[in-house]
């Protein structure tokens, strides 16, 4: 059943049922699903017309939800990654880190052709609540078909996707740009 809701509990229930959800993030609207549900993930790819090789970001509500993905990092780098997530104010640009990952940690469809996984711990209140209600991290990729600008409102997201998914209505965060992406192993900025 397709729905529009302001209830985080209803939105999390949709994710648990293998459905796709559009929701506001720090800077743009995102599309999300249970990262371990391949059918839901492939629906996102079809909606976006995105190749599976690109991979997607995982969004967590707190460090505890992705702690096991930090295990292979050097302790100094690990501390830097965690600090970047936990000390950022709500109006600062979000940071997504590329972390080394093995295929037994996350499904290969999440990483695409890469040997790293893109992870962000959010401080956007609605996204934090959604991840907590879902009881884990979720897929987060911008709500737009390939080649078009990401949606910045419910109206734009629904214009792109219509009745093809569920919508959690709420406010965008205060950031004006999508997250910065940094390779945790090399320190290289992938997207500034």
Swiss-Prot record:
Keywords, ordered alphabetically: ATP-binding, Cytoplasm, Nucleotide-binding, Nucleotidyltransferase, Transferase, tRNA processing
Enzyme nomenclature, EC number: 2.7.7.87
PROSITE patterns found in the cross-reference section: YRDC
Domain of life: Bacteria
UniProt enzyme class: transferase
SUPFAM superfamilies per UniProt: YrdC/RibB
Keyword Cytoplasm part of the UniProt annotation: yes
Localisation per UniProt entry: Cytoplasm
Chief localisation class: cytoplasm
One Gene Ontology cellular component: cytoplasm
Reactions the enzyme catalyzes: L-threonine + hydrogencarbonate + ATP = L-threonylcarbamoyladenylate + diphosphate + H2O
GO molecular function, one term: double-stranded RNA binding
Listed GO biological process terms: regulation of translational fidelity; tRNA threonylcarbamoyladenosine modification
Pfam families reported in the protein's UniProt record: Sua5_yciO_yrdC
InterPro entries attached to this UniProt entry: DHBP_synth_RibB-like_a/b_dom (IPR017945), Sua5-like_dom (IPR006070), TC-AMP_synthase (IPR023535), TC-AMP_synthase_SUA5 (IPR050156)
YrdC-like domain sequence ranges: 5-192
Membership in a protein family: Belongs to the SUA5 family. TsaC subfamily.
Record's function text: Required for the formation of a threonylcarbamoyl group on adenosine at position 37 (t(6)A37) in tRNAs that read codons beginning with adenine. Catalyzes the conversion of L-threonine, HCO(3)(-)/CO(2) and ATP to give threonylcarbamoyl-AMP (TC-AMP) as the acyladenylate intermediate, with the release of diphosphate.
Protein name according to UniProt: Threonylcarbamoyl-AMP synthase
Organism: Acinetobacter baylyi (strain ATCC 33305 / BD413 / ADP1)
Lineage: Bacteria, Pseudomonadati, Pseudomonadota, Gammaproteobacteria, Moraxellales
């Amino acid at each position: 059943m397709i729905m529009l809701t302001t209830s985080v509990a209803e939105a999390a229930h949709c994710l648990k049922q293998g459905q796709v959800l559009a929701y506001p993030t720090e800077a743009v609207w995102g599309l999300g699903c249970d990262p371990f549900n391949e059918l839901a993930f492939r629906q996102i790819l079809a909606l976006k017309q995105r190749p599976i090789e690109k991979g997607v970001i995982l969004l967590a509500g707190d460090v505890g939800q992705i702690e096991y993905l930090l295990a292979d990092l050097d302790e100094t780098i690990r501390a830097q990654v965690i600090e970047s997530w936990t000390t950022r104010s709500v109006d600062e640009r979000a940071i997504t880190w590329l972390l080394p990952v093995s295929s037994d940690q996350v499904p290969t469809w999440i990483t695409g052709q890469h040997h790293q996984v893109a992870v962000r711990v959010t401080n956007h209140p609605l996204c934090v609540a959604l991840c907590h209600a879902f009881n884990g991290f979720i897929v987060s990729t911008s709500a737009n078909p390939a080649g078009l600008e990401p949606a910045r409102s419910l109206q734009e997201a629904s214009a792109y996707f219509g009745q093809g998914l569920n919508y959690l209505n709420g406010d965008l965060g205060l950031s004006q740009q999508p997250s910065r992406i940094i390779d945790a192993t090399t320190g290289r900025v992938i997207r500034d």
